[in-house]
């Protein structure tokens, strides 16, 4: 498609079943589209042997495609991105989950969208156009929709999906946003979009289908929901 290179940051924790599948899908769809890329696996000391699987994948696909940058323990999503950016050789960075909830088939669409509008950030959205969520029960859908609706009213971010974590950034833009954010956990993704608006960065959107994880347990719990509410109040008061 171009001489651009895309560094895909994959923070992992207990994803030994999912990592081989997401890696295969990434290589399939990006190679078919002629996209130059690398996958940077940032494993935070997974006790299930995720890193061992990542090493096997590196042996299969090569060190240029699979870059391993593990850490000793869980240190948070924001610091995982900072760690990954330091090792990224692409001029664009893609962030996504390793649990198969984000399908790599949407990445070429995100790249095309970025080129069309010369956007600083392109976000995959579940809440616009043909986007949607599959595999969630009604309660979780209501919580997610409700949180997004309240956030839209309070923060007016200029994007339809604030809590999603499937995005394409210019590398320098992601670096500045990550360094400016103070939130932890799920609020971090929301703050990234709010700060992007604050700094005057342009945001494009591509509708995506979000699928609940197939293997492993969801990391969303009561403490994350409380943290989300606190983070929303903080951002409303400070932006």
Model-derived regions, located:
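N-proximal low-complexity "stem/linker" segments adjacent to membrane-targeting elements
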Residues: 1-28, 34-35
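Conserved sequence signature across two-component system core domains
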Residues: 12, 42-44, 71
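Acidic helix N-cap motif at the loop->helix transition within catalytic regions
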Residues: 17-21, 48-57
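Conserved donor nucleotide-binding strand/loop of the catalytic core
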Residues: 37-40, 51-87
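A conserved acidic beta->alpha catalytic loop
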Residues: 43-51, 100
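Acceptor/aglycone-binding surface of glycosyltransferases and processive sugar-polymer synthases
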Residues: 69-87, 92, 104-186, 213-230, ...
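Catalytic donor-sugar/metal-binding loop of nucleotide-sugar-dependent glycosyltransferases
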Residues: 157-158, 180-184, 193-211
């Amino acid at each position: 498609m171009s001489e651009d290179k895309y560094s895909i940051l994959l923070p992992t924790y207990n994803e030994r079943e999912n990592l081989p599948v997401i890696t295969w899908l990434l290589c399939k769809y990006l190679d078919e589209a002629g996209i130059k890329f690398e996958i940077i696996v940032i494993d935070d000391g997974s006790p299930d042997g995720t890193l061992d699987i990542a090493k096997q994948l590196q042996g299969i696909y090569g060190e240029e495609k699979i870059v391993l940058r593990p850490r000793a323990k869980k240190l948070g999503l924001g610091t995982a991105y900072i760690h990954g950016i330091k090792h990224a050789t692409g001029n664009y960075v893609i962030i996504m989950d390793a649990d198969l909830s984000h399908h790599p088939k949407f990445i070429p669409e995100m790249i095309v969208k970025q080129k069309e509008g010369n956007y600083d950030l392109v976000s995959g959205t579940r809440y616009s156009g043909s986007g949607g969520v599959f595999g969630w029960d009604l309660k979780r859908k209501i919580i997610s929709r409700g949180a997004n609706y309240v956030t839209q009213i309070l923060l007016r971010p200029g994007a339809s999906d604030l809590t999603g974590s499937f995005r394409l950034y210019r590398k320098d833009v992601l670096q500045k946003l990550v360094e400016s954010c103070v939130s932890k956990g799920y609020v971090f993704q929301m703050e990234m979009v709010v700060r992007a608006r604050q700094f005057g960065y342009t945001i494009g959107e591509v509708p995506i289908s979000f699928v609940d994880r197939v293997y492993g347990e969801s990391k969303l719990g009561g403490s994350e929901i409380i943290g989300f509410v606190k983070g929303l109040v903080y951002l409303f008061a400070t932006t």
